[in-house]
Amino acid sequence: MLHQKIAHKVRKVVVPGISLLIFFQGCLILLFLQLTYKTLYCRNDIRKQIGLNKTKRLFIVLVSSILHVVAPSAVRITTENSSVPKGTFFLDLKKKRILSHLKSNSVAICNHQIYTDWIFLWWLAYTSNLGANVFIILKKSLASIPILGFGMRNYNFIFMSRKWAQDKITLSNSLAGLDSNARGAGSLAGKSPERITEEGESIWNPEVIDPKQIHWPYNLILFPEGTNLSADTRQKSAKYAAKIGKKPFKNVLLPHSTGLRYSLQKLKPSIESLYDITIGYSGVKQEEYGELIYGLKSIFLEGKYPKLVDIHIRAFDVKDIPLEDENEFSEWLYKIWSEKDALMERYYSTGSFVSDPETNHSVTDSFKINRIELTEVLILPTLTIIWLVYKLYCFIF
C-alpha cells in the first residue's frame, strides 16, 4: 500500500515534469521548422504554406499527446442527426481512434468553460484531417507570449484588441484571405485584391472561383462569449444582459454577436457550415466553475482532469442565418445560446448530452491522435531527454 502511494506521488511529479519538458522542446523544434520553411521557401508561397501547415498539424499532435498523457480523458461526441449526418463521427477500428467527415470550410462556435477548450475544438478538426487548417481568434496580448506568440503569428491566428474600431480591418483582411484562398482566388494563387481602401482594407472579388488552383480549407474557431465562465465573468455578463434588455443565462455567458456576424458575412462566398458546439466536463457541478476545478495547473501539474469530456455538435447552413440585419442576427444568436443553456441544464441533470438515439448519434473513445505523427513530433524531444538522463547518470556514477 505504501509502495503504491509512493509510486503515485512520484508519477504525479515525474510525468508532468517530463511532459512539460517534451512540450517546450517540441515547440522549439516546430519553431525551428517554421523558420526553416520561411527561409527556404521565401519566394515560393505555396511550398512555404504547406510547410507551415505541417508544423501547425504537428502542434495539435504535440498538445493532444501531452494532454492525453497527463489527463487521459475519454471523449463522448454527440451529434444531432437532423443537421449533422449520422456517422459523421465514427470510431475507426483499424486506426483505433475517432475520425470524422466535417465540412472543409467552416466556423465553429462554442461555450467557454476552461482554458483548454480550444484544444478539444482543434482536435475535432484534426479528426477530419483539418488540423493544419485551424484558425483561432485570440486576445491580442497572447501574440506577445515568448516563442508561442511567434508560432501563432506564423499560423495566421487572428489577434483582437476587443476594440472594434481597431479590430475591424485586422479581422476583415484575415477573413478575406481565408475566403479567397479557399476559392483558389487569393494571394496563395498569386492573385491580388481588386483594391485596398484608405483604411487598409483589402477588397477581393467574392464571385471568383478558380478550379485550377489549390483550394485551402479553413476551420475558424470562435468563442462568442469572449471569455471563460467564472464568478466574475458571470457578474459582468449579467450587467451586460441588463444593459441590452436580455435575461442572463444560468449555465453559459451571454454571447457577443458583432465578431461572429462579421466573420460569417466575410466568409459567406466559401463557407459550407457553422458548427455549434457545446462542451461539458464530468466532475463540474452546476454551481461550480470549470476553470477552478480544471485549471492549467490542476491539469498539467496536479493530475486533476475530467474523466469524460462531453461534446455536443449541431450544424447550420449559413443561408438560413439572418446575417443582413444586425438585430435579427443578435436575436438568432441569443436563441442559439438559450438552447445551449438548456442543453447544459440537461447535462448537469443527466450527465450526458444524449437524449434520444433516434435523433442523436454518439461515439465515445479516448483522446487519441495518429501514431505516425505522434512519433514524428515526439522523437527528437524524447531522444534529448534520454541523452540528458544518460549524462546525469554518468555524472553521478
UniProtKB/Swiss-Prot annotation:
Q: Where is this motif: HXXXXD motif?
A: 112-117
Q: What does a knockout show?
A: Phosphoinositides (PIPs) with stearic acyl chains are strongly disturbed. Induces disturbances in intracellular trafficking, alterations in the budding pattern and defects in actin cytoskeleton organization.
PANTHER family, alphabetically? 1-ACYLGLYCEROL-3-PHOSPHATE ACYLTRANSFERASE-RELATED, LYSOCARDIOLIPIN ACYLTRANSFERASE 1
* Family to which this protein belongs: Belongs to the 1-acyl-sn-glycerol-3-phosphate acyltransferase family.
What subcellular locations does the record give?
Lipid droplet
Q: What class of enzyme is it?
A: transferase
Protein known as: 2-acyl-1-lysophosphatidylinositol acyltransferase
Q: Which InterPro entries match?
A: Acyltransf_C (IPR032098), Plipid/glycerol_acylTrfase (IPR002123)
Instruction: Tell me the function of this protein.
Output: Acyltransferase with lysophosphatidic acid acyltransferase (LPAAT) activity. Fatty acyl substrates include 18:0-acyl-CoA, 16:0-acyl-CoA, 17:0-acyl-CoA and 14:0-acyl-CoA. Responsible for the acyl-CoA-dependent introduction of saturated very long chain fatty acids (VLCFAs) into phosphatidylinositol, transferring saturated FAs with 18 to 26 carbon atoms. Responsible for the incorporation of stearate into phosphatidylinositol. Overexpression has an effect on chromosome stability. Regulates phosphorylation and expression of glycerol-3-phosphate acyltransferase SCT1.
Q: Which organism is it from?
A: Saccharomyces cerevisiae (strain ATCC 204508 / S288c)
Encoding gene per record: CST26
Q: What is known of its domains?
A: The HXXXXD motif is essential for acyltransferase activity and may constitute the binding site for the phosphate moiety of the glycerol-3-phosphate.
Q: Which domain of life is it from?
A: Eukaryota
Query: Pfam families under this entry?
Result: Acyltransf_C, Acyltransferase
